[in-house]
């Protein structure tokens, strides 16, 4: 298994109430992953991308896309695979929240505007 394959496995984090609750209480991180990825590949990808993190367990599930109506036509969202990654106690994956990044850039631009 090469490093290029490992970089393509993790598609992104899942930000939901359930994933936040699991992360805070049990140390579980939730990711969208490649639909053909195995549990071992997910474990290696997380340990490679987030240095110093030890993965204890990986649970995966396939999520069926919802059927949605767009006016008269019926469409369907894409299916995807999700992984619940349990980390060793006391460890955490550092991911930037989009809201925090926007708030930080807004604060820094307003500070520079006031200084000028």
From Swiss-Prot:
Transmembrane segments: none annotated. GO terms for molecular function: rRNA binding; structural constituent of ribosome. GO terms for biological process: translation. The keyword 4Fe-4S does not apply. GO terms for cellular component: ribonucleoprotein complex; ribosome. Keywords: Ribonucleoprotein, Ribosomal protein, RNA-binding, rRNA-binding. The keyword rRNA-binding applies. Coiled coil: none annotated. InterPro entries: Nucleotide-bd_a/b_plait_sf, Ribosomal_uL23-like, Ribosomal_uL23/eL15/eS24_sf. Pfam families: Ribosomal_L23 (PF00276). Part of the 50S ribosomal subunit. Contacts protein L29, and trigger factor when it is bound to the ribosome. Belongs to the universal ribosomal protein uL23 family. PANTHER family: 60S RIBOSOMAL PROTEIN L23A (PTHR11620). One of the early assembly proteins it binds 23S rRNA. One of the proteins that surrounds the polypeptide exit tunnel on the outside of the ribosome. Forms the main docking site for trigger factor binding to the ribosome. NCBIfam families: PRK05738.1-3, PRK05738.2-4. This is Large ribosomal subunit protein uL23. The lineage of its organism: Bacteria, Pseudomonadati, Pseudomonadota, Gammaproteobacteria, Moraxellales. The gene is rplW.
């Amino acid at each position: 298994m090469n490093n290029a394959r490992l970089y393509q496995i993790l598609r992104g984090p899942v930000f939901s109430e359930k994933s936040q609750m699991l992360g805070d209480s049990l140390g579980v991180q939730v990711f969208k992953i490649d639909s053909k990825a195995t549990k071992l590949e997910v474990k290696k990808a997380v340990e490679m991308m987030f240095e110093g993190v030890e993965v204890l367990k990986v649970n995966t599930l396939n999520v069926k896309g919802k059927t949605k109506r767009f006016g008269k036509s019926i469409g369907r969202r894409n299916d995807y695979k999700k992984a619940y990654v349990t980390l060793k106690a006391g460890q955490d994956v550092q991911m930037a929240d989009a809201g925090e990044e926007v708030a930080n850039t807004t604060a820094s631009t307003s500070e520079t505007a006031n200084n000028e």
